[in-house]
Amino acid sequence: MRKRINLLREFSVPLIAGVVVALLWANLDPAGYHSFIEQPFFGGMSFHFVVNELFMVLFFGIAAVEITQSCLPGGDLNPLRKAVNPLLATLGGVVGPVLVYLGLNAIIGGPELTRGWGIPTATDIALAWLVARLVFGAGHPAVSFLLLLAVADDAIGLAIIAVFYPDPNHPTEPIWLFLTVAGMVVAYILRSLKSRSYWPYVVVGGGLAWTGLFKAHLHPALALVFIIPFLPHPSRETAHLFEADPRDTSTLARFEHDWKIVVDFGLFMFGLANAGVGFSSVGAATWLVLASLVIGKTLGIFAMGYVGRALGFPLPQQVGAKELAMTGLVAGIGLTVALFVAGVAFVEPDIQGSAKMGALLSGGVSIVAIMLGRALNVRRIP
C-alpha cells in the first residue's frame, strides 16, 4: 500500500485529479461549482478560503523547508560558488517570462492585463521534477540542475507574491506586520530554549505570522515561510533535494516528513478550488501566460546558463546546449504557483479565468518536452 501511495504522490496524481474534476464540474455545472467553492460552509469560511489561505500555508511551508535545507552547509545551494550557474539560470527563468509577458501584452493585451506579469515566474517543482526524470532519466545531472533553479525560482516567486500582490480590495496596513515579526521572535525564542517539537513554532509563531499577514491584507498563506527557518536543524545538510535522510531527526526534518504527504494529497483540493475555469475562458491572458512560461523560461534559462559559463561558472557535466534548452522548456510547467498567482493578480472573473487557463495549458509542456527529448536523442541516464 505504501508503494502505491508513493507512486500516486510521485506522479502528482492528486493535483491532476483535482484539476480534471474542477474543469469538468465548472464546464458541466458552473453554477453548482462556483456555489460550492464560494459559499461559506464552516465558520463563515468558504472552501476557496480554507484551501488558499489555510491549506496553502502548509504548501508554502514545505517549500520553505526545501529552501532552508538547500542553503545549509552541504546543501545544494551552499557554498554559493557551486550554485552560481543555477542561480543565474533562475534569474533568467524569472526575468525572461516577465519580459515576454510585458512585451506581448503591449502587442495583444492591454493595461488591464499588466498585473499578470508575476504569473509565469515560478515553476511547479513536483511536475517539473517528474517530467525531467522522464526526459533525462533520474541520474542525469540536468535533473539536479533543474531542481536547484526551481527551488530558487520558488523563493523568488514567494517574494513576488508577498511584495507585489497585496489584496486589491483592501489597502495594505503595514502596522499589522508587527504581529508577523512577533511570530518570528517567538520562533527564535523557542529555538533558543531548544524546543524540539514543531507544534509551538507552527501554532504560536505561525499563528501570529498568519494573523499579521491577514490583517495587513497580504497573503497569510505565506505565514510559515517566516517561521520555518527557525526550526532546529542540523548544522550541515547531508541529503540532496527530494532525498530523505533517515538519520536526520531534527525538528525541520520531522515537520517535512509529517506534513509532506498531507500537502501532496491536499493538492487535490487546491486543484478543485482553483482550476475550475470554463473552456470559453481562453483569451489574451491565456496566450500571454502560456507564451511567457514556454518561451520566456526556455530563452531566459538558456541565455543565463551560458552567461554563467562565460563568467567562469560551468554548467554540470553532460549538460550541453540541447540539455539546457530542454531544462528551460521543462521549467515552463507553472501549474500550481501560476494558478495561485493568477487568483491573486486578477479580480475580474473573466480575466482571472483566462489567465488560469494559460497556467493549466502549461501542463501540456510535459508532453512536448518528452516528445522533443526523444526527437533530439537526449541521452537518458537511469
Curated annotation (Swiss-Prot):
GO molecular function of the protein, one example?
Answer: sodium:proton antiporter activity
Coiled-coil annotated residue ranges, if any: none
Which keywords does this chain's UniProt record carry? Antiport, Cell inner membrane, Cell membrane, Ion transport, Membrane, Sodium, Sodium transport, Transmembrane, Transmembrane helix, Transport
Tell me the GO BP annotations in alphabetical order.
regulation of pH
Task: Extract the Pfam families matched here.
Answer: Na_H_antiport_1 (PF06965)
Q: How does it sit in the membrane?
A: Multi-pass membrane protein
Q: Which reaction does it catalyse?
A: Na(+)(in) + 2 H(+)(out) = Na(+)(out) + 2 H(+)(in)
Entry's InterPro entries? Na/H_antiporter_dom_sf (IPR023171), NhaA (IPR004670)
TM ranges are: 11-31, 47-67, 88-108, 116-136, 145-165, 170-190, 261-283, 299-319, 327-347, 353-373
Asked whether the UniProt record includes Transmembrane among its keywords, one would answer: yes
Localization recorded for this chain is: Cell inner membrane
**What is known about what this protein does?**
Na(+)/H(+) antiporter that extrudes sodium in exchange for external protons.
The record's section on PANTHER family has: NA(+)_H(+) ANTIPORTER NHAA, SODIUM ION/PROTON ANTIPORTER NHAA-RELATED
Family classification: Belongs to the NhaA Na(+)/H(+) (TC 2.A.33) antiporter family.
The name this protein goes by in its record: Na(+)/H(+) antiporter NhaA
Query: What would be the name of the gene that encodes this protein?
Result: nhaA
